[in-house]
A protein has these predicted regions:
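ABC-family P-loop ATPase nucleotide-binding domain
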Residues: 1-28, 325-336
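ABC transporter nucleotide-binding domains
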Residues: 19-24, 29-226, 231-232
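Preference for bulky hydrophobic residues occupying beta-strand positions
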Residues: 29, 42, 250-252, 283, ...
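Short, surface-exposed acidic/glycine-rich loop or hinge patches that mediate macromolecular interfaces
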Residues: 83-86, 230, 255, 285-288, ...
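Short phosphate-engaging motifs
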Residues: 88, 214, 257-258, 290, ...
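Structured loop/turn residues at secondary-structure junctions
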Residues: 145, 155, 253, 286, ...
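Non-catalytic connector elements of ABC transporters
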Residues: 270-336
């Protein structure tokens, strides 16, 4: 970041505005007869990774486009670090960067040339542009392909370059729209580490994703979006807890003890256990404090356990519970 850009961003942010990166109330966007976004409220604290999770066509990209000043809301309002996205467009744009679902790069140029051009356009000197391009190519594992034209890049390599181009100047607020779409598992994990480093060095991240494991691994908070609305919001743990209790798994050392273990579990836990397979007893943990009593009762009955484990509801279960059957994608809904 140049000295001039740093000074501008420092003046815009101000110490009194550092608590909240995004505040949105009642955001609405209508395309024809379709309310693509229908009264969305968001509150994104500074210095966190915040995920918008939802199926295709849920409205995630439209929300991003309104928050980044690319679309004007038809209702509601939103502020970035206290600055209105409609009335203070130019100020907001100095505080953000956006990586979309398609790369804004020139296939006829090399990776290094693309990054240097972006850097020069952002106000870096020629030497700063060269240095920053080299740093980003190394950061995203593209140094060996620095001089290769993009028409010879794989989809995953292009995705990494697209993210790198958006980080030439690290903005206080970074929007990542499906940042790991099309990447192989190893590259996805590398990208996650890069995203975590951005937050560690001072940025706030708002990302959209369809990958449940990605939201679970990365996000401090998640808003589940379905049919243009926020249907749930919270930490991954809070969302899992909201749809059901954790499940206790008791693997018995001897299968012949199964019936007695079920009887004791039902008596102590006050719930109905199940036996999904021989020598395995499972029960919802309606009252976690009673688990210790159960273990004592099983020991007194001389029932030995091979293993004891507790399983939380998964984010997959949260997603399916909140967005119907988990298979609806609303492909008929077109987001610009």
């Amino acid at each position: 970041m140049t000295t001039q850009q740093s000074e501008v961003r420092g003046r815009i942010l101000g110490p009194e505005q550092g608590g909240s990166a995004i505040e949105a109330q009642g955001l609405v966007k209508i395309f024809g007869d379709n309310r693509a976004v229908d009264g969305v409220d968001l509150s994104v604290p500074s210095g966190c990774i915040y995920a918008l999770l939802g199926p295709n066509g849920a409205g995630k990209t439209t929300i991003i486009n309104m928050l980044t000043t690319l679309l004007k809301p038809d209702g509601g309002n939103a502020k970035v670090f206290g600055h209105d996205v409609v009335h203070e467009t130019q100020v907001v744009r100095q505080l953000i960067s956006l990586t979309g679902q398609s790369a804004a790069v020139d296939e006829r140029l090399s990776a290094s040339e693309n990054l240097r051009i972006f850097a020069l356009l952002l106000g870096l000197s020629r030497s700063e542009a060269n240095n920053r391009a080299a740093e980003l190519l190394e950061e995203f594992g593209l140094a060996d392909a620095a001089n290769r034209t993009l028409d010879k890049f794989s989809g995953g390599m292009r995705r990494r370059l697209d993210l790198a181009s958006s980080l030439i100047v690290q903005a206080p607020l970074i929007f990542l729209d499906e940042p790991t779409s099309g990447l192989d598992p190893r590259t996805r994990i590398q990208m996650w580490e890069s995203i975590r480093r951005l937050v560690s060095s001072g940025s706030t991240i708002l990302l959209t994703t369809q990958y449940l494991d990605e939201a679970d691994q990365l996000a401090d908070r998640i808003a589940v979006i379905d049919r243009g609305r926020v249907v749930a919001e919270g930490t991954p743990h809070e969302l899992k807890a909201a749809i059901g209790k954790a499940t206790l798994h008791l693997q018995l050392a001897d299968q012949k003890d199964t019936a007695e273990a079920v009887r004791i579990a039902q008596t102590v836990l006050k719930v109905k256990p199940s036996t999904p397979e021989p020598a395995l007893v499972t029960a919802p943990m309606a009252d976690p404090d009673r688990v210790t009593d159960l273990l004592v009762s099983l020991r007194e009955a001389k029932i030995q356990l091979a293993t004891v484990s507790v399983e939380e509801p998964t984010l997959d279960e949260v997603f399916m519970a909140l967005t119907g059957d988990g298979k609806q994608t609303e492909r008929g809904v077109t987001e610009p």
